[in-house]
From Swiss-Prot:
The modification Phosphothreonine is found at residue 52. The gene is SCRN2. The keyword rRNA-binding does not apply. This is Secernin-2. Belongs to the peptidase C69 family. Secernin subfamily. Pfam families: Peptidase_C69. InterPro entries: Peptidase_C69. GO terms for cellular component: extracellular exosome. The active site is at 12.
Length: 425
């Protein structure tokens, strides 16, 4: 039986800034992925592709019908599954997803994970609004469900999404196959493991209101407040913690309204006092991402990814789509083929070592920081210097002060990953 207990530790935080909240004419997206503390997150580049009509695509648990063309994507994902916690595509669409529990029960059986829906939307969409339509269409056709952790004990949930592109953002919140969405055309917004769309609904499932009325959750007369109507009546402690993180994140965004930059977002993701940078028992922030999506379509989008846990002791490394982009091998986990615990039935009966090269080096670096204060500080300074170099280079690029060859842009992430790996050697 699928567990849908919101008491189970699981948390994430997503943020977006749309001008005039941003300091520059760009939409800025950010996310912390909070997962089991030993789960490895890899960064995977998937090139654009063409596919045979009628072919099938294997996602984490089920197959779906493939489309004829897919876009290039960069994904930050738990290395055991097909989908992703967060990512971007070549058209400047970014998506992050989070766990949520509502009055709608979590369905039994395997379907699409919210993380599968995220990747499918990135591969098939050229705008945030189109990505929303892709997710809701797949949700209606295939549903969502299946174990969301690499563990024999079942643990399932529904999903919320923050979707952004160069011009706007959308919040999409689901309850089973039902959903509500809110469009953000200016200002800053965040989501944190709870329903947050109230009466300001920009789009919705056609049966959302009739379903709520049939269940006795809404009388059909008063204001239709999605979060109030579909949230659990008795909020457990875990959800109260999510509410506190949501409020803290909203306040951090409010304090920097009009001046939000990539660095500001990185600072928010590193905020430990609020719990946004999480390290609690068996869970922690396992990977982080910040994206700068310029409104000028002639400028490249820049995506910063850590590929390592704890953003306060990690390096945000720049990735830009373009010529010369290839997989950085140091952030790719080993594969186990048909013997992978996610592929064999019953699933997750054994464990495998999914640590990639950068993860191993970073793991050793964290140990050094805790054992030897002086050497640890030196190593952390190297991290900060490398990150600052990436920030300054990309700022120069967007300001027109740096015009490298296209192949150099495409290999930027690989170069920074290599240098970080060498720093840990």
């Amino acid at each position: 039986m699928a567990s849908s207990s919101p008491d189970s530790p699981c948390s994430c935080d997503c943020f977006v800034s749309v001008p005039p909240a941003s300091a520059i004419p760009a939409v800025i997206f950010a996310k912390n992925s909070d997962r089991p503390r030993d789960e490895v997150q890899e960064v995977v580049f998937v090139p654009a592709g063409t596919h045979t009509p009628g072919s099938r695509l294997q996602c984490t648990y089920i197959e779906v019908e493939q489309v004829s063309k897919t876009h290039a994507v960069i994904l930050s994902r738990p290395s055991w599954l097909w989908g992703a916690e967060m990512g971007a595509n070549e058209h400047g669409v970014c998506i992050g997803n989070e766990a949520v529990w509502t009055k709608e029960p979590v369905g039994e059986g395997e379907a699409l994970l919210g993380m599968d829906l995220l990747r499918l939307a990135l591969e098939r969409s050229s705008s945030a609004q189109e990505a929303l339509h892709v997710i809701t269409g797949l949700l209606e056709h295939y549903g969502q469900g299946g174990n969301c952790l690499e563990d024999a004990a079942p643990f399932s949930y529904h999903s919320t999404f923050l979707l952004a592109d160069r011009t706007e953002a959308w919040v999409l919140e689901t309850a089973g196959r039902l959903w509500a969405a809110q469009r953000i055309q200016e200002g800053a917004r965040n989501i944190s493991n709870q329903l947050s769309i109230g009466t300001d609904i920009s789009a919705q499932h056609p049966e959302l209101r009739t379903h709520a009325q049939a269940k006795g959750w809404w009388d059909g007369q008063g204001a239709f407040d999605f979060a109030q109507i579909f949230s659990l009546t008795q909020q457990p402690v875990r959800m109260e913690a999510a509410k506190a993180r949501f409020q803290a994140g909203r306040e951090l965004l409010r304090q920097r309204q009009g001046g939000i930059t990539a660095e500001v977002m990185m600072g928010i993701l590193r905020d430990k006092e609020s719990g946004i940078c999480m390290d609690s028992g068996g869970f922690r922030t396992t990977a982080s991402m910040v994206s700068v999506l310029p409104q000028d379509p002639t400028q490249p989008c820049v995506h910063f990814l850590t590929a390592t846990p704890d953003p306060s002791r990690s390096v945000f490394k720049p990735f830009i789509f373009g010529m010369g982009v290839a997989q950085a091998p140091q952030v790719l986990s080993p594969t186990f083929g048909a013997q992978d615990p996610v592929r064999t039935l019953p699933r997750f009966q054994t464990q495998v070592d999914r640590r990639h090269t950068l993860y191993r080096g970073h793991q050793a670096a964290l140990g050094l920081m805790e054992r030897d204060q002086d050497r640890g500080q030196q190593l952390q300074q190297k991290q900060q210097d490398l990150e600052q170099e990436g920030l300054e280079a990309t700022q120069g690029l967007l300001a027109g002060e740096w015009a490298p060859p296209l192949w150099e842009l495409g290999s930027l992430f690989q170069a920074f990953v290599k240098r970080e790996s060498q720093a840990y050697a």
